[in-house]
């Protein structure tokens, strides 16, 4: 089977086999948000909005973004980024989607039932990402898509495709397309290096370079309402205006506080909006000057409004969900209730508090606290922090290892510890009076009230665990047992592994599988030969989650076995695990926090448990 055939088969399996998370007993904690890469407003209903995410979800709002739910299957496009959503101007109710794959490749499909089902249209397209799409009003069946190799077109709604820019080797990575509303045979293509135009439906092309810097990647092309021929291009270096469909460009940047500008919109009242990776910028003088407005932590991927409701403006943001303005961009509010496309980097429970660390979420990145085991998360319980990589409790205090330093919680506030500065701290672990922080370059330990560097005369530490009265540490080539008086090298079944303590056993996991070493033993015992990850759950009985390929297993101390768990998302997306109040919680990268009651229904009846070596506490 060729790669194209394989991708097609995989795509159709995704469309038919995806099930809602609730169908298998899983539900989501109410931490709303998403990495929203595209929006589409229904042409006939300004309150109906679709949102596509970087994790393959498609959400639908019927109340102008106040609430969201799955448009169809819970995860219709796993492994794909929903980069483009377009309603067909020639086919009422038809919604088109353009996808690009995390592992490569792309897809084009349409839905005639508001996202409940999809029909693939890729015959003749290369196995490349679909970065953008343009449909042509008055030209039924004509569609353009931008790919890595240029512009491809169809005249029969995707039944067949042909490359339109084959004679232009520089017209690569087409990330934006625009069809002139007054001249449907005129199409502009923005590429990784400036833009091109065709005036004959894509048969021939001309570079439209005058006034534009050579290395300008053109992210978007936007017309100005009521001003034929005037368009704006956003690039990696501010914005450009052309009065004549790209015949000549002029760059504008005065007032911008960030140059990289993925999105743009020209409002009917004459104001211009430019969405940068560091907030929204507004111009009231035709683009001569700009001023940032709103939260600078928002990375804005798209700006949308409906002609019937131009005062209502939607922002699609990277990691921060959807933001909506009801007053013509004077103010914006987050509006993502029901979206679970959040990235969870850590889970922990301390006393009555459940802590969930969200990352890459703009202004809501940090630690969210629930005092009712995840039923609600209060705004007062949120603390913005750099990406949290680990959480631990030590002698009455909570510590957070982050991408920019080690933090300690004092009361309701968090404080960065000065000794480590802004270095990346990947792990923090305690045992009795000992507290150790592992950074990207070394080890630190708490002595008295200060952290000091602990000698480690090996490579960059990759993992650490307290076990048997010693600190065990791996680097890229070996395993070492450290005590106050010794520094011993320990043989391992493979190099480059990571450590995890499982009661009275030490587990080694990584590309060489998962192995266990019981206390007082010197031999490693293989659990699986598949590349694996182990995640602690903080629970005495159900103490560890093992991810091996597409298989997820939960360790049961009573039976001393790993039991297979059915999960509703790709196993690779699981980033953290916690058992709390009789429930298994999974933190994910792109699907929020998933929760399932512990019980036999969690485990498929046909799956045989995997045993672990017996130990006294095993």
Regions found by a protein language model. Name each.
Residues 1-8:
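Bacterial N-terminal signal peptides that target proteins for export
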